[in-house]
Amino acid sequence: MSVNKDIIIALDEGTTNAKAVAFDSHGRVIAQFSRALEIATPQEGWVEQSAELLLAASLEAISRTVAAVGAERVAALAISNQRETVVGWYRETGEAIAPALSWQCSRTPAFCHKLRKQGHEPRIKAVTG
């Protein structure tokens, strides 16, 4: 007997929590899980989060929601994230290079302005889009 893949799970990896919600084929919420996240402000205007905790909270939210509905029923996973929040990961180890720089952080405008003045903007746009 085959099982219908009739569930879509949406992960909202937000600033304050990672939340996964399972929807059935009629758009009804049938399961959900949320894990709170912490924000750090190590200096005035800086906003960052632990990249490892963002990943762990997201994986936990997905895992618990999948467990509630049964993996065999899941057709797809949709992911939304925190705007321009950035995390770099080491390819070899899978560890974060640094904390996640939040979209709320204001530490980089002066650096970006300097790069523009030095003529690097076209290259950066070509590489990053």
Question: PLM ranges: what are they?
Answer:
Residues 104-129:
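Glycine-rich phosphate-binding loop plus the immediately following alpha-helix
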Residues 1-98, 110, 122:
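N-terminal glycine/serine-rich phosphate-binding loop of ATP-dependent small-molecule kinases
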Residues 101:
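Glycine- and other small-residue-rich loops at beta-strand/loop junctions that grip anionic moieties
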